[in-house]
């Protein structure tokens, strides 16, 4: 709210598409999991990260540096339980299929399943929906018409489009923005102790400056913009 941004619905107000906290939306995610499981679009995948690192058939790496899950770990048969339990579940991608969409900023985007990304997790070991499934379910049930996010999630969009298709849902439009970088050319992220809104406020940066810089990054297509040193 300090930035002057307001929203029509959310956890701190009324709305027609709640609940708005993912911790309160477990039933929505479970229904989607059950549908995918019955269709055999997903399978249990108990392998740990260490298993993948030490496997004789190590995962290959895509052009974007993403590890592609080895097809050798796909089970031939499995019983569909009533609940996912405490084991990861992966979506089986259609190998060789080109997933394409027209991004409102970058234009035509294409990814090849099985090459640019592999079978991906939709249900986590701690018995919670993984990011890819949760955002698809939320956006569909909340009737989101346009998703705006960073261009580092372009491949995630391809994965999510496969989920929309498998669930028989219409997907929203997508607008992927350029990334905001610091003065060293690094993306602003929690994991790298990137600059936060709280820190900008402490330094006396005005809401107007933050908004203007963000808008400038959206306007410039196909080029990253660095945070000004002023």
Spans of features found by a protein language model:
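Non-catalytic terminal extensions that flank enzyme cores
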Residues: 2-3, 8, 82, 94-97, ...
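A short, terminal or domain-edge coil/loop segment
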Residues: 33-44, 98-109, 224-230
């Amino acid at each position: 709210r300090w930035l002057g941004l307001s929203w029509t619905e959310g956890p701190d107000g009324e709305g027609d598409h709640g609940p708005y906290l993912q911790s309160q939306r477990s039933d929505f995610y479970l229904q989607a999991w059950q549908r995918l499981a019955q269709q055999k679009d997903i399978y249990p995948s108990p392998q740990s990260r260490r298993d993948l690192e030490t496997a004789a058939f190590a995962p290959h790496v895509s052009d974007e540096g993403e590890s592609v899950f080895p097809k050798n770990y796909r089970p031939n048969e499995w019983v569909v339980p009533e609940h996912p339990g405490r084991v990861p579940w992966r979506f089986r991608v259609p190998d060789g299929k080109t997933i394409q969409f027209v991004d409102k900023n970058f234009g035509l985007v294409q990814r090849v399943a099985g090459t640019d990304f592999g079978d991906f997790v939709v249900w986590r070991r701690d018995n919670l929906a993984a990011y890819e499934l949760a955002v698809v379910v939320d956006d569909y049930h909340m009737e989101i018409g346009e998703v705006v996010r960073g261009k580092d999630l372009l491949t995630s969009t391809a994965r999510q489009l496969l989920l929309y298709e498998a669930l028989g849902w219409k997907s929203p439009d997508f607008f992927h923005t350029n990334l905001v970088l610091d003065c060293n050319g690094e993306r602003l992220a929690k994991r790298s102790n990137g600059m936060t809104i709280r820190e900008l406020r402490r330094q006396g940066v005005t809401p107007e400056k933050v908004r203007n810089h963000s808008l400038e990054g959206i306007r410039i297509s196909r080029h990253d913009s660095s945070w000004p040193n002023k």
